Regions:
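Ligand-binding loop in jelly-roll beta-barrel domains
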Residues: 97-101, 132-135, 185-204, 301-303, ...
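Transition-metal
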Residues: 1-147, 211-240, 270
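C-terminal amphipathic alpha-helical segment
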Residues: 206-278, 282
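Loop-centered beta-sheet repeat module
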Residues: 156-207
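Short, basic/aromatic beta-hairpin or loop at an interaction surface
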Residues: 148-161, 281-289
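Short acidic-glycine-tyrosine-enriched beta hairpin
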Residues: 168-180, 297-316
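His/acidic/aromatic-lined binding-pocket segments of jelly-roll/cupin-type domains
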Residues: 93, 102, 119, 125-128, ...
Length: 335
């Protein structure tokens, strides 16, 4: 079984999805001939909703990462993390390439998940835009104005897709932008947007706009029925406060660029590392996604498209080379 004392390069891990995409993931990984899907779950200890194994990452020796962490959580995650979360990475990282617009949907909060789904984690997420295609790459975030429960129920019952999408705030995005998506916030990612996504480690989604995307409505409400599932939706208007969710970081040339504001700290952390020479990284469980260039993490070779899981037990590591990478980490611990 893989030990938690050195970084491990991971292959692609692509559980089947209902929507199109994947060309940008294939291009990043340098394997454009492969039949890539729209999502690549990196260092995943999370399964697809309702599935036993689909979605789990496998280490090079054939061990599931989930099992390796469970066997030695302190080595993989660190003593302080284990004291708070046990043998739970508390993080899921994805590469997501939207080859079509995704449906309007949202995710439950910790409180809703605990009450209705018997799970500690809901699904707050953040998007790091790393590439776009097309003339108007757009994401849709939160209702423009307050929407009553009755109006939303009517849209969902009638599958009034046009009105649901029109009710959201459209935001043009470019590489370097980040978007924080709190649990409950209705949203959709537009065609041509390629992101590194950090999220809580669940696959809980309430699909408001299921027609044309899912086989039937039953798949969209987490087995709760829409009457209960819609209780997780944020009905508030966000037009006046949308800027609190968005950061534009493309022009920041610092060696380490924090990508999220403090509101993300209880859920995850991410930095863009822009290395020309060497950079020392403190000990932490982390997921590294290399966007450009090449180099080494310790003695582990890296190139564009490399995805790496770094155990806390690897200790302080030096990143050498000429490269740009996203470093993803679990929630910031208090104290």
């Amino acid at each position: 079984m893989s030990s938690g004392d050195r970084p491990v390069v991971l292959p692609a891990n692509q559980p089947k999805q209902f929507y199109r995409g994947g060309a940008s993931i294939a291009a990043l990984r340098g394997d454009e001939s492969a039949d890539f899907g729209p999502e690549d779950w990196v260092a995943s200890t999370t399964t697809l909703y309702g599935r036993d194994d689909a979605g789990l990452s496998t280490l090079p020796d054939g061990t599931l990462l989930r099992d390796a962490v469970a066997a030695d959580p302190t080595a993989w995650l660190g003593e302080r993390h284990v004291a708070e979360f046990g043998a739970d990475t508390a993080l899921l990282v994805k590469l997501l390439d939207a080859g079509q617009r995704l449906p309007v949907h949202c995710h439950p909060s910790n409180e809703f998940a605990s009450t209705h789904l018997n799970c500690r984690h809901g699904k707050t997420e953040s998007w790091i835009v790393v590439g776009t295609s097309g003339d108007e790459p757009t994401v849709y975030i939160g209702f423009r104005e307050d929407v009553s429960p009755e109006l939303l129920e009517g849209w969902v019952a009638a599958q009034d897709n046009d009105d649901m999408l029109a009710a959201l705030n459209p935001v043009r995005v470019a590489a370097g932008d980040t978007v924080f998506v709190p649990a409950g916030l209705p949203h959709a990612i537009g065609e041509g947007v390629f992101i590194v996504e950090l999220q809580q480690p669940t696959d809980f989604s309430v699909t408001l706009e299921w027609k044309g995307f899912l086989a039937n409505a039953d798949i969209g409400h987490l087995g709760l029925g829409y009457d209960a599932a819609l209780g997780c939706v944020d009905h508030n208007g966000w037009a006046k406060t949308l800027d609190t969710l968005i950061r534009r970081t493309a022009g920041d040339t610092a060696e380490v660029v924090p990508l999220f504001s403090e509101q993300a700290d209880p859920f995850f952390q991410a930095d863009r590392l822009q290395v020309s020479g060497s950079l020392t990284l403190e000990a932490s469980f982390a997921v590294l996604v290399v966007l450009e260039g090449e180099g080494k993490l310790g003695d582990v070779p890296l190139r564009k498209g490399s995805t790496v899981v770094v155990p806390h037990g690897a200790g302080e590591e030096v990143l050498n080379g000429e490269l740009v990478a996203i470093r993803c980490r679990p929630p910031r611990l208090a104290g």
